Amino acid sequence: MAHSVKIYDTCIGCTQCVRACPTDVLEMISWDGCKANQIASAPRTEDCVGCKRCESACPTDFLSVRVYLGSETTRSMGLAY
């Protein structure tokens, strides 16, 4: 089952999510909108298994990468927005 992976503009280009993904769904692409001049991209969402390791690895408190499982959106597990 494919999942939708949303990348938000709080991405700092650290590559933690890319390295955490067991199915290589994510990759870094050039982007001038952040300090690192790169952002995570999800070109292979059909391979996403919904493990959410990318969310756990994200140092910006789940705000950069969110995995949507069907109609359910992920929750930030008690983090305030």
UniProtKB/Swiss-Prot annotation:
What's a Pfam family this protein contains?
Answer: Fer4_21
Question: What's a GO cellular component annotated to this UniProt protein?
Answer: photosystem I
A molecular function (GO) held by this record is: metal ion binding
Please list the cofactors this protein needs: [4Fe-4S] cluster
User: According to Swiss-Prot or TrEMBL, what is its membrane topology?
Assistant: Peripheral membrane protein
Signal sequence span per UniProt? Answer: none
Q: Which biological process terms from the Gene Ontology are attached to this UniProt entry?
A: photosynthetic electron transport in photosystem I
Indicate the segments forming the 4Fe-4S ferredoxin-type domain, all copies. 2-31, 39-68
- The answer to whether keyword Plastid applies is yes
Q: What are the subcellular locations of this protein?
A: Plastid, Chloroplast thylakoid membrane
| Location (main, coarse) | plastid
Enzyme Commission no: 1.97.1.12
Kindly state which reaction or reactions the protein catalyses.
reduced [plastocyanin] + hnu + oxidized [2Fe-2S]-[ferredoxin] = oxidized [plastocyanin] + reduced [2Fe-2S]-[ferredoxin]
Q: How does it assemble?
A: The eukaryotic PSI reaction center is composed of at least 11 subunits.
Q: Function, please?
A: Apoprotein for the two 4Fe-4S centers FA and FB of photosystem I (PSI); essential for photochemical activity. FB is the terminal electron acceptor of PSI, donating electrons to ferredoxin. The C-terminus interacts with PsaA/B/D and helps assemble the protein into the PSI complex. Required for binding of PsaD and PsaE to PSI. PSI is a plastocyanin-ferredoxin oxidoreductase, converting photonic excitation into a charge separation, which transfers an electron from the donor P700 chlorophyll pair to the spectroscopically characterized acceptors A0, A1, FX, FA and FB in turn.
Q: Which NCBIfam families match?
A: PS_I_psaC
UniProt-recorded name of the protein: Photosystem I iron-sulfur center
What organism is this sequence from? Anthoceros angustus (Hornwort)
- Gene that encodes it: psaC
